[in-house]
Amino acid sequence: MEYQEDVFVGYRYFETIPGAAASVCYPFGYGLSYTTFALSDVRGGMNGAGEIALSATVTNTGLCAGKYVLQAYVNPPKGRIAKPAAALVGFAKTRLLEPNESETLTVSFAPYAFATYDDEGAVRKSAYVLEKGAYGFRVGENVRETVNVDYRYELDDDAILEQLSPKCAPTLLHRRMLADGSYREIACAPETPREDWRKLEGIPDEGQYPLENPDQIPGCAWIPPIKPQLIEVAEGDLTLDEFMSLLSDEDMARLLGGQPNRGVANTFGFGNLPTYGVPNVMTADGPAGLRIKPECGVTTTAFPCATLLACTWNTEIVREIGAAGAREVHENGIGVWLTPAINIHRTPLCGRNFEYYSEDPLVAGEMAAAMVEGIQSEGVGASLKHFACNNKETNRKDCDSRLSERALREIYLKGFELCVKKAQPLTVMSSYNLVNGLWASQNRELLTDILRGEWGFKGMVTTDWYTHAPQYTEIAAGNDVKMGCGDPAHVLQMMREGRLKREDVVVSVRRLLEMILKLA
């Protein structure tokens, strides 16, 4: 699936491409109200933190009480790199304003919020840049109904904000869209020859390892506990290094696969090494409320779906919903809630759009961060998913998302980046699909170089359930646990053959145990 529209997704397309605007009935950010509002004293400038601060006084000019969302958009200068005509850089929402009541709102953001990733070297290859020129700003109630801010962020020379290196470069993407609606061929990286993993490892077409008893996921039989116990690490009597030094390769291989359900859970668990007191931490979906086994007869709350939550533009409400849902999750004996989902509304045809927040990565990232903060405030782990580019449902285990590095970073990874840096979810779930020719679950540039190296992610990565990539390639890439079950024997075989480093296994086990200790 080629993302030839590049960064021109959603309103970025309709506000930029000539002739496209007429197709829009409801512009991005549009909302209904029982009252009317007016903006006054609109200002802009730099604050003491080196951020751009845009402010406006909002007055309720109608007859009913209401709230107003102040949305801030950047209008970048034209340059060597094609840019959307408008992009959201921040938003704020008033309290409930009575008729004739006013409130002054301020939206602050760093210049990085509107930087461009240069994947072709027009300014500086593999860097976030700001081309020289004047960057204008507008504020208002949607992308169309805005007023100009009498402030420009002006640069006499190009600025390099962050120098990175090429990651996840496309190998089979034919062209990319430009700001005038035309297309240009894109230079692709040479395709790296890869072995046919399934044939090599004897993996069946459905991507799952054959089990001796197909009706039961392999687990651990209960064995009377012996010392040491993981709780001794939690209580400070043992270091994690000391505890892990006593685990055999067989113990570690078992820990890196999903574990059987218990209680009301139906999406399996993590851990489950009773000999060493490692609990079986249960997981459960999902993005619209806790989903458990229907035959249990336990009812749960159906919270509004992610798209509806994003329509509130209210991160505090989303944070409270995350906390409320997490309390319900905890009451049902679940340790990790498999939410939020944060993929982009690239097309209305994606079957999981109800789980996703927005076509805009800033909205998605801010909402997801609030949700994660709410969930984890109650001692429950959040799982940020699906990392990354899960934008179709049919055949999503084998679909190859082919896109430029720029589109990947500015659109499809940006929400994940915002959420990770702001909220540090305990887990991230990699997606089924391939990203530029490599399954996301075995993509080291994505899971290690970008997620951990660039963004500073501290948690554990799991696969989505029953991915097609061999488990040992996933572990080597930084994907710690294979769900819903792994294959310990296969992992051990790859270790013996030298195709999987023991140190990679140790690192993944450490991340798993650190996650469990944070839940204890």
Task: Give the role of each language-model region.
Residues R144-S165:
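Extended, polar beta-sheet/loop recognition surfaces of beta-rich domains
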